């Protein structure tokens, strides 16, 4: 089990050391190394059983139930500290591969086994989490069969990881091109963010629940923007909401309250919740208003942090006060020829990652049940099936 909160106080955190995991690091099969905080090696050693290593499985037992991830051999760090809402499992690898174990609990059957042990009052939690998990039974094929399933998932994950790495490079390239652009912008005309784009606020989607017979749309909130998709537990809204607050792949979304985020959405059709802007323009290409909004993002984050008495946010006046430099049409066209294809490729890669994830999740239960033989799935042909998702 993770340490009590009182064992890791704010003053324990340092710039580098042993990373501390939280729920945001358990969003997929493998842990991710985003938004980590650190404690000293000495402090980590004092926490004993809260220390997790490569090959360990981490489970959330309080809060966002259903989260379960393993620490891969390729993790950025050798050791991690789990939070007070998590527990660590160290499996007998002569019987079960950690990857296969985690995959099972990501299937509908596995999720049901976890969530059926949820307590019914207060904060969502597993009753007697470690002993409860020890009593769960799962079907285990031979290690060779497990390895086939694991290799199939790894093959998809490698493609997803490659796309993400390409997007990291393309994002850096966009930043470099934008910085170079600013060096020659001395004679350009001035405007504001509100002059170049529309920042459409979402709706309080709890007022627009699906009507009987309407499967609805998932609601895009700040959490979903941060994780890049709408999970199975996302709230839903009616499917005939106004197009102005309907989000499609490639739309630029800016959360202006709470955690300020800016990203191109690639999670499929959704309804835009309040506290997020859908950014569009009839006069300028998406790269232009994206890069200028991003240019001011650090300022917006600082402004939100200064609002200590309320949830951090920015006002629309901040957009009106944010300067934009606009080149003449010929120069803008040249810049667009250089910048827009990069943005388009980033979006294409993000959408492909989502579809690969959906394909993986659809096939995984069939692979684990033996309905599909993993050794007979040709990973090189997966792209031919992405249009089905």
Describe each region flagged by the PLM.
Residues 79-87, 119-150, 270-277, 307-333:
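A short glycine-rich beta-alpha junction/loop motif
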Residues 7-15, 35, 116-118, 189, ...:
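Short coil/turn segments at secondary-structure boundaries
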Residues 1-9, 135-204, 225-228, 325, ...:
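Non-catalytic DNA-recognition/assembly elements of restriction-modification systems
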Residues 1-29, 98, 103-107, 115-120, ...:
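Extended, non-catalytic scaffold segments that flank or surround catalytic motifs
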Residues 1-11, 24-57, 194-209, 216-249, ...:
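Sequence-specific dsDNA recognition surfaces
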Residues 22-23, 42-110, 122, 241-298, ...:
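A short beta-sheet element
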Residues 373-389:
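Amphipathic heptad-repeat alpha-helical coiled-coil/stalk segments that mediate oligomerization
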């Amino acid at each position: 089990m993770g340490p009590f909160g009182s064992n890791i106080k704010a003053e324990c955190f340092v710039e580098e050391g042993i990373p501390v995991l939280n729920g945001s690091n358990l969003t997929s099969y493998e842990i991710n190394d985003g938004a980590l905080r650190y404690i000293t090696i000495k402090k980590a050693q004092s926490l004993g059983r809260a220390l997790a290593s490569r090959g360990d499985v981490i489970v959330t037992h309080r809060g966002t139930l259903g989260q379960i991830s393993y620490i891969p051999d390729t993790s950025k760090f050798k050791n991690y500290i789990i939070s007070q809402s998590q527990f660590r499992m160290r499996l007998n690898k002569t019987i079960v591969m950690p990857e296969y174990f985690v995959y099972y609990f990501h299937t509908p059957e596995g999720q049901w086994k976890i969530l059926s042990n949820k307590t019914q009052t207060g904060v969502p939690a597993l009753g007697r989490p470690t002993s409860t998990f020890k009593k769960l039974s799962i079907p285990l094929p031979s290690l060779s069969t497990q390895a086939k399933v694991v290799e199939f998932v790894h093959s998809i994950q490698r493609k997803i990881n490659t796309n993400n790495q390409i997007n990291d490079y393309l994002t850096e390239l966009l930043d470099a091109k934008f910085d170079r652009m600013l060096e020659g912008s001395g004679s350009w005309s001035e405007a504001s963010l509100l002059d170049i784009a529309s920042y459409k606020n979402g709706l309080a989607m709890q007022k627009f629940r699906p009507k009987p017979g309407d499967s609805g749309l998932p609601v895009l909130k700040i959490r979903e923007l941060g994780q890049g998709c709408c999970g199975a537990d996302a709230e839903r809204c009616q499917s005939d909401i106004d197009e102005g607050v309907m989000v499609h792949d490639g739309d630029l979304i800016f959360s202006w309250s709470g955690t300020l985020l800016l990203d191109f959405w690639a999670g499929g059709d959704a309804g835009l919740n309040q506290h997020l802007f859908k950014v569009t323009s009839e006069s300028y290409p998406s790269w232009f208003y994206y890069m200028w909004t991003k240019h001011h993002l650090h300022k917006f984050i600082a402004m939100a942090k200064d609002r200590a008495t309320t949830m951090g946010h920015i006002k629309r006046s901040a957009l009106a006060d944010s300067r934009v430099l606009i080149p003449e049409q010929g120069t803008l066209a040249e810049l667009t020829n250089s910048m827009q294809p990069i943005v388009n490729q980033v979006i294409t890669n993000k959408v492909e990652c989502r579809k690969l994830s959906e394909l993986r999740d659809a096939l995984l239960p069939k692979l684990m049940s033996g309905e599909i033989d993993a050794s007979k799935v040709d990973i090189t042909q997966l792209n031919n099936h992405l249009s089905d998702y």
